[in-house]
Amino acid sequence: PTSALLLLPVYRRVSRLFRLSDLMRCNGLVAVALTVALSGTVQAQSSGDDSSFPRKTNTSEAQQARQAQDAFEQTHRQGLRFYNGGADATCEEEIGRICYWNNNGDVPAPAERSDAKVERTQLISILERATKVSSDDDWIMGMLVRYDIEADRPDSALKVARACTGTAWWCSALQGLALHTLNDHAAATAAYQKMLNTMPANLRCSWTEIGLWLSSDSASQRAYRARPCEERMKSDMKLFRLAQPLWSLPSNDLYNELLARHTMSTVHGMGRIPYDIGWGNDLLESQVRYGWPVNWSVQNGGVGDPRPPSVIGHEPTPSYDFLASTTALANPFSATSADWPLNRKKARMRYAPRYASGYGIPPYQFARFRRGDSTVVAGAYRLIRELEMGRAPYNAALVLDALDGKDPIVVKRDNAPANAALLATIGATPFVASLEIVAPNGRRAARVREAVQPLPATRMVSDILLTTTGDPSARPSLETAASMAFGGADIDGGTTIGIYWENYLNVTPAAPGTTLIRATRVGASFLQRFTSALKLSKAVQPVSQRIQDPGRPDGGPGRSIALSWPQVPDGDYLLTLVVQNASGRDSTSTLIRVRDRK
């Protein structure tokens, strides 16, 4: 994503390296103390005395640090490189003075000039000297953590944050920011919880509210903010849980990201930034919704455009909208994978997790099997080329959450293959299932999430699980089928797949059963139905089999066959399986999508 400011002054590119000390002498800069009205920020009292936040010291080292920070950002802005992307970009969101557009997949931001990196290192050295005599200076500690993170030194940022002796809640916030940047999710959560427990109540309400993520309607925003803070924070936990990118992680990194955005925004509001405007609520909103910029550039409007270049702030890419739909929020136990559209247009928020350079939705299938009063859920996946997961190993997880405050059911498999199924047992209540695969080498993640209902005790047949081949043994089992799960419902015409199901009727040689298997095209035309009725085409019903079932010698329910799928037109086909004998009849179906190999 990229945000750009419009109608800004023309900036002169700087080609030579300025030493910060020289620039400060030449310009006669003095210490700058910006007082910014951050949304919800008040004169917060630090623990132990009456000093207000941000606490600032007046040592010579502190004054030099403030001068150096202001000088660095002036030079930084003047030397920004021109951006060659965004030719077709239009404002996706106009936020005050900011034009925001999503540039996932666009030209990357230009590399930062090398002298800017040197200048930042010089600034860090000045800030480090200041911390040795002013570790209780909230401004200095915040700036040093900020620039350590900008310089890709998160370990140094954490060391600085842990040495902070200023306002208690602010020191915890800086620790949370550094830990979040390091992907230490559990420790970041602990640090931010400590921050929330010690910061002023009205500031805590401001930092945790997510009205900007939910709706652009002002009435909805007012209604959201009108709710009592503690009530709102409690109900928001459901939204954060459903939006958490990976349930297999030890903590909710999206919640940490919200607090990290507020932390970094507070630091940005304390001093100069590359945008040549004062801090304001529009900048705060932009960063709370889409994150803070990690690269900067400038761009002309083109030939004949009289406007001066715009400063462009580039947030991390690719980024995604992890929020569940309003339908899923209202009724999560009826949700489908479509309720988590990662690439939603005109998203109210986006997030680029640092532990994964890309997210995708894999081909998948959930299938259910009875075990007494319980249900075994099979979550099958397949890693396809388009996911760009890279080489093995892969770590897979199936997480089922009843959203009742209890610990979720978690099944993990390290060194997982590219296609398989994980098995988990649930009771009589519905769950939301999250099937997750992470590729550590490729730094990619794939995830699918939808509701799973227990298989009713009255059902006489399980769901259908697609497998790569049939199991010819006399005792097919779910565990064997899971190991060769096809993963997904997209197949090529003219191929053979396996199917596994379980028959819960009392089938014996004395009371044999019959299994009917057929596939019917969804939305077939009149001509296709007519030619199929005359047996001239298999386009409407490519599969039709009747199997005699005398039961298994051991009485087990598992069944498996190989299913030949003829070459048929692309489209959706409903695969239906019917089991019956003298004691009863039942059926199950699953949707198959046939793709053209060409």
Model-found features: residue ranges?
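Helix-turn-helix repeat elements of alpha-solenoid scaffolds
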Residues: 73-76, 80, 111-125, 146-158
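Intrinsically disordered, low-complexity terminal regions enriched in Ser/Thr/Pro/Gly
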Residues: 53-96, 100-103, 329-598
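Bacterial N-terminal signal peptides
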Residues: 28-39
